[in-house]
């Protein structure tokens, strides 16, 4: 009776099913838990069955999970009512695991004017350190007493090295505080993490902002 709904949920809500297995099925989600899928919906007992492969034992395991209390009046005799209950369970399970309902499986590179200006600003100290005429060329465009004083102060290997180190440490701290938690929250696959971290070291907060923007474009991922 629910075959088409089961197929739809398995196709589009793998993360939600995994969350339900962890939160409502009380199964720890480790690397050994693979291929979580919905196999049955039983409205008579108000349960659904999840099946998954446990690679350490090599066994396919079934877990029967009760639907949460239907306190919103959803009719479990209809596909619409079942979808609404699943949506609620997906949201609750994701919140309990402190994860997003959606997954970001791409790398968003800097493309806005602000992003590009930040990259230019990051590149200037190393450029001036390696090629000192670049420093003088920059301040040639600002011929005033303040510019001359600042140029004289920056015209030092020690000062430029300190700026480069401070820049790196600041961005590393921003990456640790803002980017890393979002990579976990948005379930970014491991193969994309190194690029996101590298962008964090280059830009600081920028990648965190792009992760949030990408998440907003993906929406919540309800059962349709």
Swiss-Prot record:
Keywords: Endoplasmic reticulum, Glycoprotein. Signal peptide: none annotated. One of its GO terms (cellular component) is endoplasmic reticulum. Glycans are attached at residues 10, 70, 74. The keyword NAD does not apply. Its main location: endoplasmic reticulum. It is found in: Endoplasmic reticulum. PANTHER family: MEMBRANE PROTEIN, PUTATIVE (AFU_ORTHOLOGUE AFUA_1G04315)-RELATED. This is Uncharacterized protein YDR476C.
